[in-house]
Regions:
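Solvent-exposed loop and beta-edge segments used for protein-protein assembly and interaction
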Residues: 34-36, 49-51, 83, 125-127, ...
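Bacterial N-terminal signal peptides
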Residues: 9-18
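Mature extracytoplasmic domains of secretory-pathway proteins
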Residues: 51-118
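N-terminal export/targeting and maturation segments
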Residues: 21-64
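Basic/polar N-terminal segments that are highly enriched at the extreme N-terminus
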Residues: 1-2, 17-23
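Bacterial N-terminal signal peptides that target proteins for export
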Residues: 1-9
Length: 158
């Protein structure tokens, strides 16, 4: 005999996942991914004060690297859906890896995530709209949530 608590537990676990999935209706204004690109959609949970948070978008590839610092070339663009004023982000073609040229010890090669270089892309935190990103199909898109410290510090006058 199945415990009546098990179906309730499964339902309780599944509901938050269903709520976080972007509905086709929410994505309708956004263009489909063009050939060779993938569309990535991030649904952010609601925060008490969303102005105190930012989302950092990080794109890159998992490559075989050595002890040198590696970066990929690429440029983010912020675009707007026509007629909707919804923003989305597009990463253009990602160039070859750039690297420092230090001598590395033998057997220092490993698989690691190599990000697209340049300034980090920090975007406004908004749980009411999906965060839509278009990137080349061979590129991974990751993100990180930044939160402001609750205290501020006065700037000294000079």
């Amino acid at each position: 005999m199945t415990s009546p608590k098990l179906p309730l537990l499964v339902l309780a676990c599944a509901l938050p996942l269903a709520a976080c999935a972007a509905t086709p209706e929410a994505l309708k204004p956004y263009p489909a991914a063009s050939s060779g690109y993938n569309r990535h959609v991030i649904e952010l949970p609601a925060q008490a004060d969303e102005a105190e948070h930012k989302v950092e978008l990080i794109a890159g590839k998992t490559l075989e690297v050595d002890c040198n610092t590696q970066r990929l070339g690429g440029q983010w663009q912020e675009k707007t859906v026509e007629g909707w004023s919804y923003n989305y982000y597009e990463l253009g073609q990602v160039g070859p890896a750039m690297s420092t040229l230090m001598a590395c010890p033998d057997n220092s090669r490993k698989q690691a995530f190599v990000p697209v270089g340049g300034e980090p892309l920090l975007v406004r935190y908004n749980s009411k709209l999906p965060l839509v990103i278009y990137a080349p199909a061979d590129v991974q898109v990751r993100y990180r949530i930044w939160s402001a410290a609750p205290d501020t510090s006065p700037a000294p006058q000079q």
